[in-house]
Amino acid sequence: MSQRTALLIIDMQQGMSWPSLPQRNNPDAESAIFGLLQHWRFRKAPVVHVRHISRIPGSPFWPGQPGVDFQFALAPLPHEHVVDKSVPDAFVNTGLGQWLHQRDIGSVVVVGVSTNNSVEATVRTAGNLGFQTYVASDATFAFAKKDFAGTPRSADDVHNMSLANLHGEYATVLPAQALMRMA
């Protein structure tokens, strides 16, 4: 990472840890995210916390619902930037790109959930906007789901396919420890 690098933490909210969700992979993702967060804070590097706010009444991410709140261990400090989004891509209608450019940030490390949704959407846009983009493979996770043909896919399958979609085209995908050594 040759440029000033921000850590983007995507949708690490209370609702993402509810037991009613489908089976997920990377049970240690929160620990890896916490390690990266501590590393960024120690270096006094920029951290951005992205929060999903649903436009669907009754959603766990509807304003005022407990699912909207950040997970306690990963909650932002007062000086850390918070971005509220209502679509998967953290750059759409949020000012995130402008905020990064105003601070001369040319590189981002993206972590959080879910790999195939908000993480992938945000990473694609970051890469398309010219940011040097990294994804921490062990600091992201996905949920099991059916593919377009109706075949059940494990959370690992969904996660790994999403990372394959991103690596080499929109981002460089590496484990958290490797990214900490580079930062």
What are these regions (language model features)?
Residues 15-19:
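Short acidic, Gly/Ser-rich segments with clustered Asp/Glu that frequently serve as metal-coordination loops
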Residues 21-49:
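A short alpha/beta connector and helix-capping loop motif
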Residues 49-55:
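Conserved non-catalytic scaffold segment of RNase H-like nuclease domains
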Residues 2-6, 34-38, 42-43, 55, ...:
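Active-site-adjacent betaalpha module
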Residues 7-12:
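N-terminal nucleotide-binding beta1-loop-alpha1 segment
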